[in-house]
Every structure is written in structure tokens, then in C-alpha cells.
């Protein structure tokens, strides 16, 4: 791409979005698209994927189609682009037939630069006819088709949607093939290859910016259901001034936890919302809008909430239950800290979570109805594989960040996350320093004898049992089930009587995770021998585990790590003295007033970072105003006078007070 084209891209970025430079990876994606090349961008949530197709769409003649899976994303992106001075549109089922006709009519007239559409609509006859007309000679032109959440096309991913398989057919039906750009935040190498093949990308420029979100703290704690509810309540109270999301695996849990939190937090003024697929469309839309508009501080939701929610100031995401995969967890947790400021991601789990997940897997998914028997069986097996990786995350005593980075194939970042101090080795490394495992003191314990006992017992049993029953037998339990099945006669019964059932069960889990034992699929998995079972009989066999030395000390260190990150951010970004803090709150109030009047989210007017920039620079002219990062020419023209007047009034008041 020519230097002049690159400068035009930077000018477009500044005019519409208020930035003077692209983030890492954005420039390469924009360059590839403007050079006429297909592109695949794998960029973490908050890295600015939308900029990669919005900037070219604002530069290229014609209309860019953006394929998006959710109505909320279409509507929010359209509002944000309108606020920035662009000409976007969307076409989905929330519009009446008359409104859809109007949108298509205006599109034919060349009034729009972008159009957001759902994958299900692409082959709908009326839309397809419009798209083919636009892409034909003499039409308005279709220079680019951008595909968001592209991992949905892959059956290897955690969120396969059959409608995404229509995208390639749609593109191939156009008279002139457009540039095709696909974007995702979560994709292993296998999923990336699937995306390229299923979408028909031609020699794409592939940009993988890495998966490490350094501003996020990751915590993982095992606890009972009652302890979870108390933990969430206490955490939300301690962070009452912040926006957060609490994810639950079922609608029932969402309703129960949201009700409990609302009752407990109501007196403190913290508003709690709930969101799941069992609610009506209007109720979900209203709740989502209230959260985006900062009228609700805490959203308790199933995974039906969040995809496409572009709310930058979410300070924490708590998973009250285990998600179905590492991909799902990374994507949902990644909704925290999109503004780049420190944020926290906490996973609370117990064995019941995995039993529920296995039940949900066996029950099947609505998307499975479009699959044949062979595909359905494969999908079931794949979901169990993904859940197994999630179980490994919960049980690891290593760095949580490293576990996820290695899962996604980001080896360089994983090595960096656990890099040793100068002069040390990898074994000496203290890890990333920003996850609960790295901030926990562990003791290494040799449990070779226990491991041998467990594997040998499983090897002698012709009938397979679950972890709990095996642990009971090895402990020497006197339960009715053990007596009825005569398991108290087994060789190995009571051989680990000095250990607790929970301890034995944990060792069995570790043996499964390392391949000495293995669990079957299904809601009630049983334990069998793993591929490495024979190794336990080797004289050199050794099996060690790590045990937490002090949970209390670990929790204190974890809190301190997040506090340090936030203190660093405050030094650079937040109002530092009393009058700056007062001005910040006044500008927030003005932003809320403007956004309410214009029916848009507050961050679509100016972001929190932009408000902090206004507090520091206190601009008095338009030229000074557009020096604030995140305030472009379009927004300066739309909102600048009101904010500069508020700053001038504030300074006048303080000048009088100081006189």
C-alpha cells in the first residue's frame, strides 16, 4: 500500500475515532484490506477488531457488509458509528417490513457506507437480490465483506453456528468478488485453518496479535455453592462503584443469584440486572441497555449475554459456574477491561459445575438439529474434549495465564508469562504475577505411593466406577453402596484409610489429568486406565502434586496485585487531585445527560479515558480538543462546545472560590 493511502487511513482514524495511531495489528489488517487482499485477524477482545474493517469501509467506495451474529452488536455498532459521524445501517428482524424496505431503498441510493446483517439473512431472496445488484457493474459496489465472530463457522470451535456456513455461498454468488476479512478473538490453529477453508479466504493476510491481556487478573477458586453466593455478594459490595458481569450456567441460577444480590445490595444503592434466553426480547433489550447506559452496575447472566457488548469500562467478570470451554471462558472473561485499565476475572467452581456441564452436553444444542447423526456424534465428542481442557484449567497449580496462552498456541507469550527472573531458570519462575496461582504459595508433595494404589485398584476392577466411589473404597468407607456391592472385599479397600476422601479424589483427578487414568464421557463419567498407566510399575516412577500453603495469604497477595495495577493506571489516567476528580464527575454527568437525550450509550459520546484527558488538558479551543486521545473531528464538532463550556464554567467557579 502506498504512503499516501496509509496517511489517508490515519486521517480517517483521527477524523472519525480520534486516535493518532493504530494499535498493534490494526495497521497490518487495514493495509492488507486496502491493498485488496483477504485477511484473517485473531485479536483479543478489546484490541479494536472493528477498527480494522470500519476504517477501510469509510475509505472505500460502495457499501461494506458486516456479518454479525447478534442484534445487539449491530445496533450498538451502528449507534457508535453514527456518533462518530459515519453513515452506517443495519438490517435485522428488529425492524418492521416497512423499515427494512426503507433501509434497502436508501442503500440502493448509496446513502450508507456500512450495513450490518445476520448470517441467516444473506441468502434471503430479497437481500441477496439487493447484494447482487449492488456488486454488479453499474451498482453502488460491494468492496468488502467483513465477518465478525468468525470462529462460529468452525465445528472445532465452542460456538459453531450452521448459518455461518452460508457466508461462502453468499460471497461466491456475487457478480464481483469483494475483499473478505474475518475476525475473531478466540481461535486455535485448527480453528483458524477451518475459518480459512469454510469462508473460502484466498491467500489471506493472517494477523495474530497474541492472546495475552496483561491488564487482566485471573483468579480460580474451588468452593461450595453457598460459599460462591457469599463470595460474589462480598466482592460486588467491595467494588460498588464499578460495572461488572456475573456469569451463571443456567437460567435458574441467574434468577436465584440476581434476586439474592438485589436484596442484599439494594440498601447500598447498587442496581442488579439479570439476562437470559428465558426472558422476553423487550425485557432483555431493556436490561442490556440499562447496563450499557450505566443505570445497572451488575449484570447476572447466562452466556446469552455479552457477545457484541462493546462496553469498555467493565471492571470485573465473575464466573459463578464453569463455562463449557477455554474459548468460551477467554471470550467471556475478556469483556472486562476493554479500555485497557486493570480489571479482574474470577472463576468459582466445584464438582457440581462439571456434572451440570456434562448434563447440558448430553442434552444437546439447538444447532445440532441441522447436523446428521455422524456430525452430531462428532460435535458431542468435541464438546467433551473442550470441557476436559476447562477441567484442566481449574485443576492446574501452574500459571493460569500460561495455561490459556499455550492452549491457543501462543507459545511466545506463554514463555514470557512465566519467564524467570534474571539469571534464573524456567523452574525458578514466579509466573505472570497476576493470577491466583502465581500469587499462591505451593508446597510440593510426593504422593507416589497413593498414585500407585489408585491406578492398581482401577486396573483390578472389571467394572468401572466414578471418582467418588473409588475414593470411598480406598479410604475404607462403610457406606451402604459399598456393602451392597461387596466392595469392602476388594483388594485395595481401606489401603488409603489415613487420607481423606477429598484428598484421594483430588489425586485421582490429577492422575486423570496427566494420563495415568482416564474418564469416560457422559453425565456420569467413570474412571479407567489411561495411556500412561503402565508407567506406575516402573521403579523410577514418581508422582508429585502441589498443595496450597496458605489460602489467606494468597488471597491477600492477589488483591494487592490488582491494587498495584490499578494504582499504576490511576497515576497515568485518573484525576489525581480533588478538583480534577470533581471535574471528572461533572463531565460524566454531562455525558450522561447528552447520551440520554440522544438515546445512545455514554461511552459513545466520550469514553472514560477521553473524559480523563479533558480533565488533564482542559481544552479551550477545537484544536486543543482534538488533541485529546479518543476525540476525533466529528465528535469534536458534535459535542465539543458543551464540554468546553462545562470546563470553562468549572474553572470560573474555582477561580472565584480561590479569590
Please give the residue ranges for each predicted region.
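Accessory DNA-binding and partner-docking regions appended to nucleic-acid-acting proteins
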Residues: 1-9, 356, 367-372, 384, ...
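Flexible coil/turn residues that form the inter-helical turn or adjacent wing/linker of helix-turn-helix
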Residues: 176, 240, 397, 463, ...
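Short acidic/histidine-centered micro-motifs embedded in hydrophobic/aromatic stretches
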Residues: 348-351, 363, 393-396, 406-411, ...
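Short, charged low-complexity linear segments at domain edges
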Residues: 378-419
